[in-house]
Amino acid sequence: MSHAQYDIAIIGGGPAGLSAAVQASKLGADVVLLDEQASPGGQIYRSIEQQSERQSELLGPDYQYGKLLVQNFRQSATQYLPESRVWSINDKREIGFTNPHGTHVIATKNIIIASGAMERPVPFVGWTLPGVMNAGAGQVLFKAQNVLPSEDVVLAGSGPLLLLLAWQYLS
């Protein structure tokens, strides 16, 4: 078990966590970012470093901002700990986590929890049938696997992610 001390520990590698890391690093803070994913970007910019130009065009102009954000993060002095799952935070500001390299504890003066948003689907009759998925699952299939529906799709619900998914499918 390792033990290190930081000025700021950030939990979450989506837009908020990356932005906080870049800014804090610019201001001279000793920053560590822990993220459960294998690459930075969170759900909204999932697999952004592996996207082709065509995929980026389909994902829209905000996606280009995500590429720039990840580039700035990679160039910052932030220590990046991908595939890290936090399992404890105590009153001494010690964070326990596991990753492929083992179990670790880090100490920090400040903690930023930027764990992102979570979809909350409403169950309905048939929602567990094959082919029925929420907007987040549709985004993951497209961003991580480059898979688009081959047949007509019915999108039901509300919210910005569903509208974005519809625009991406139509593009």
Where are these regions (language model features)?
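Beta1-alpha1 glycine-rich phosphate/pyrophosphate-binding loop at the start
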Residues: 6-68, 148-171
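FAD-binding core/adjacent interface of flavoenzyme oxidoreductases
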Residues: 1-11, 65-152
